[in-house]
Structure formats: C-alpha cells, structure tokens
Regions:
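Glycine/proline-rich, positively charged
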Residues: 27, 33, 96-116
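N-terminal binding-site loop/beta-alpha segment at the start of enzyme catalytic domains
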Residues: 1-84, 91-93
Length: 116
C-alpha cells in the first residue's frame, strides 16, 4: 500500500481509505447503501489489513451511530496504534445545541488535522 503525508501535518496515511457507510444499514439512506453486520465487517477489515490498508473512515451519523459501533467491534483486539480512524465532526447528530460540530468530541478524540 502506498502511503503519503497529509499536507504539512506530518501525518502519514495510505492513499486509500475504507469507508464504513454500509455498516449498520439503519435509516432510509444508509439501508439503501447496505447493511454490513459485525461478522462481515471483521472479514472486510481483515481483507483491508492484509492489503496494507490501515485507514478506516466512519461518522456518528452513519446509520445513527451503528457504523462506528460495528467498526469498533470489527477492530477489537487489534493494535490500535496500527490503525487510522477518520470521522466527521461537523454534521448534526441531534437537535441539542451540543449535538453538532467538534464540541461533542470526547477525551480520546484528537483535534482535526488540516491538510494545508
């Protein structure tokens, strides 16, 4: 797998990322894309890692959070420092004032990296 640096950030990432939009299949939009369960997600993660693809893209808005939960189960037991998990932090997740943007990020979440 070819890797490149993300802008001037010094962060080295693979040229490909695996998207988890099909994980969960909840809601009208995401059920139309697919409904990958945990067992299938584990199989897909294995295929990615065998090919050297270590970056997985998800978002809390994918299938109402189910995609992130399924990805978490699929990578459980793997060395976390060997994986890159990207997400979105600007979409509205609910109606509350703190349910949008980076304000809701927990203590284990690193600040966004700008590609510039």
């Amino acid at each position: 797998m070819e890797y490149r640096y993300l802008g001037a950030s010094g962060f080295r990432v693979p040229v490909l990322s695996f998207g988890t939009g099909t994980f969960g299949g909840q809601g009208a939009l995401f059920s139309a894309w697919g409904s990958t369960d945990v067992a299938e997600a584990r199989r897909l993660v294995d295929i990615c890692l065998d090919a050297g693809l270590t970056m997985f893209d998800s978002a809390d808005v994918y299938s109402k959070g189910a995609a992130e939960e399924i990805l978490g189960e699929a990578i459980k037991g793997r060395p976390r420092d060997a994986l890159i998990i990207s997400t979105k932090a600007t979409f509205r997740f609910g109606d509350g004032e703190n349910q949008v943007g980076f304000l809701r990020a927990g203590p284990g979440v690193k600040p966004p990296v700008s590609p510039e």
